[in-house]
Amino acid sequence: MKVYISADIEGIAGISHWDEAAKAHATYQEFRAEMTEEVVAACEGAMAAGATEILIKDAHDTGRNVIASRLPDCARLIRGWSGHPLAMVQELDKSFDALLLVGYHAKAGTEDNPLAHTLNLRIAGLSINGALASEFRLHSYAAGLYGVPVVFISGDKGICAEAAGQVPAITTAAVSEARGASTISIPPRLAQGMIREGVAAALAGDRKRCQVKLPESFVLEVTFNNPIDAYRKAWYPGASQSGPQTVRFVHTDYFEVLRAIRFIM
């Protein structure tokens, strides 16, 4: 079995402040280590279910967070950013049997995580077909392009609820929930156990039930914090400015939407 893991940090156990996600701050090292251990737990669950190949995308900030020496021999790690439109699922293709998402977080414009955002902090929100979109939605649709089922997600309570609403058969592991600028989190060891067991169960189940069906067409709207950014980005071919802070792009091919996001964002 060949499995893809996309890993972020803002949805791991215990995290509650931007300092904990940024290399410049001393507390980052603790949460970098926890991000790594949650990825390792996902690998262990995958191997228990029969995975022999695991590709991991370090998908937080610089893309250089996961401690490679902790990974099993059957894993390969993508570090840094190539600039490819698949972004957080770079190199994903139809050869994979499943996509797992670890440490994912609530979308911009929601109260489910003090670190809620979508892709970066320059935007107030990103919507597809009129609904605010999370990094989960963006990349689960990418998996849908290649027929790869999205079988597991761990992260905050908000993103797990969103994922279950979009893919009812997905296995979720909610490790924290928000109260304003604070979080209530389970202990890291418990989170790692939930991820390990959840991944094993998800991969052993009927993965076809976790296939993501794509809409027939896509209306992308990106709302920037600064109107100057919207003016500049609206010059992308096919895009237009639909408001002082908003850029709009319409297409029937989701890969073209991902390409637009790559250049507009």
Predicted regions and their residues:
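C-terminal accessory domains and tails appended to enzymatic cores
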Residues: A178, A191-M265
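Short beta-strand segments
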Residues: S6-A7, K57-D58, L99-G103, I153-S154, ...
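Extreme N-terminal starter segment of soluble prokaryotic enzymes
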Residues: M1-Y4
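Short catalytic helix/loop segments, enriched in acidic residues and glycine
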Residues: D19-E44
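Active-site glycine-rich loop that binds ribose-phosphate moieties when present
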Residues: N120-Y146, S154-I159
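Active-site rim beta-loop-alpha module in soluble metabolic enzymes
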Residues: A142-L203
